[in-house]
Amino acid sequence: MKTIKKDSEFYDSLATLKKHINKYIEEKVLKYSISSQLYKLEKPEIIELIKISNDYEKEKNAFNTSLEECYYKNTQNEAIKKWILEIVRNKNFIQISKEANLNTKKLGTTYKLKSSNFLKLIEIQNSPYYSQEKKDIYKQIILNFSSNINIDSLEQTIDILVAVRNRNKIKILNILNKNLKYRPENQKVFKSSLTNKESRLIKLKRMLILTYWPVGCLSKNIFIKILIKXYKYLEEEILALKYNEILNYLRALKTLSLNEIFYKGSSKNISFNYFFSDFTQYAPKDFQDTLKCYLYVIEKTITKKYLTWFFKDKISNNWESFIDALEYIEKHKLINIKEKIKEIITAKFQTEDFFISFDKTNFNPYESSIFKERYIKSAFLEIIMHYVKKNSQNIETYGWIAFYIYADNKDKKIFCQRMKEFFKSKTFEIQNQIFVYFLSFYPNIEYKHFKFISDILLYLDENKITIPKKIIKIQKINPNQLDYQKSYLLIKSLKTRSRILKIIIKNIRFNLIEKLEDENEKKLLPAMCYLIYCENLVELKNNRKIKSNEKNSLLEFISFFKTKLKQKINFKKELMKSKGI
C-alpha cells in the first residue's frame, strides 16, 4: 500500500472513522490494533470504511455481527480485506503467545487449574511418548477449556488436530473410523453438568466448532461427520431441556456467527479466540461455508428426527404455549413453518388433551401473525376437520368450532358440508347442547356467528317444515334479494329449539344489519329483523338503514309470526276454558 498524503480532508475522514471504531468495536485490543494500523490505508479505502460504518450504525440491531467483521464482509476491496484480516491474525497471535505461559499475570491471563488437571498437564509435558506438537496442542486445550474438558478422553481430538496441521485427510478418516466406531466413550470429550444446561450446550457447541474449525477448512465432509456423528451425546442432553430452552438453543445455533466464535475474547478464563498459532493460516472466511452447511444439516436432522416429538411431548397442551412456540420459530426462522405446518399440527393432535384445550377457545384463534400466511390458516382448519370426522363419535368438546367460524370464506365452503354432517350425526338434544355451549362464548352475536347457526339449522330442519302460503305470497310480491322462505324456515327451526332462540334474541347485536357488506349477506334479512325487532317493531319502523320498499314486507313477515303466536295463545285459552280449567 502507498503512504497516504496528509491533507486536511484526509484527517477529517480519519477522525470520523476513528469515532466509529472507538464506539462500535468492543474488544479493546482489537480497537487499538485497528486504530494504530489506519496509516496503511489510502484515502478511498478510509472513505469506504466510513460508509460501511455509517450503514452499520443505522442498522446495527439488524446485524448479527461486529463492525470489524462488516469491514471484511461488506467490501469488495481486496486491500481492505487483507488489511483487517492481518490485524485480526496478529492480535490473536500475540494473545496466543501471552497465554502460552502458565504464570503470566501482567501480559496474559492467569489460569485457575484444578490440581488434577495441572498435574496431568505437567505429566504430558514431561512425557517422552508425545511429540512436541502434541504437547503444545494439549497445553492450549487444557489451558483454555480446563473446567469443561475430560482430559482422559482428549487423545483422539489431539490426534485429529495434528493430522489437520499436516493436511492429512486419510489420517483423520482413519482416526474417526477406528476410534469413534469401536470406542464410543471417546466421544465424551466435554463434561456434563446439571446446571445452566441451555447456555452450557451453546458453549459446548462453540467449543466443538472452535476446536475443529481447521478440519472444516480442510474438509467440509469430515468436519460435519465429527460434529454430527462424534458428539451424539449432545443430542441426548438437548432432549432433557424444557421446550423454551430448546428453542433458545436452536436460535443460538441458527445465529451462530464467526465473529462470536473467533474474534470476541472472554472475560473469564475460557477464551473463544484462535489459540493454535500453527493454524492461523486458516482464515474464518474459508470456514464460513462449512459452518453454514453444518448448521443446515443440523436443522434438517432436528426437523426430521425430533419435530413430531418436540410438538407432541415438549409443548404444553394449551393453545397459548403452542402459538408462542410457533411465533418464536417463525420470528427466528428456525424452520420453515409453512413447509412443516401439517406435520406439526398432526403431531400435536396425537395428544388428546390439546384438542380438548380448545374447549376454552372463546376468541378468534387466527389472531397470531403466524396466520397471515393463508396456507397455514387453511392447513389448521383442514387437519381439525379431518380429526373431527375421524373421531366424530368421541368428541364431547366444541371449542374447535371457532376455527371454522373465523376461517376464510373460501375454506368454509370447502368444509361446510363436513361441518353439517357432523351436526347431523348428533341427536337433537346434543345438537342443542352444542349450540347453547357455542353461544355461551359469544355475548355479542355478529354476522359470522349468525351465518354459522343459520347454515347448520337450515340443513338440519328445512325438510321437516312446510312453508305457509302467506310466506310464499310475500316472497312473490318481493322478487328482490331477500329470502323470506329461508328466513321462515330458520325462525321455525329456532322455535323448536327455544333455548337457542332465547339466547340469540338476547345477544344478537342491534347494529348487525348495518354491518352487512353485500347482497348475499342480506338474503336472511327477514330472519335477522325478526330476531332483532320482534319485541320492538317501532325500532324497525324508525330504522333508516332499511329501504322503505322492503320495510313493509319485513313488518308483515314479523307480524305473521306474532299473529300466529297470538292465535296459538287464544286457542290454548279457549281449550282450557272448554275444559273448565
Swiss-Prot record:
InterPro entries noted in UniProt: BB0208-like
NCBIfam families: Borr_BB0208
Name this protein carries in UniProt: Uncharacterized protein BB_0208
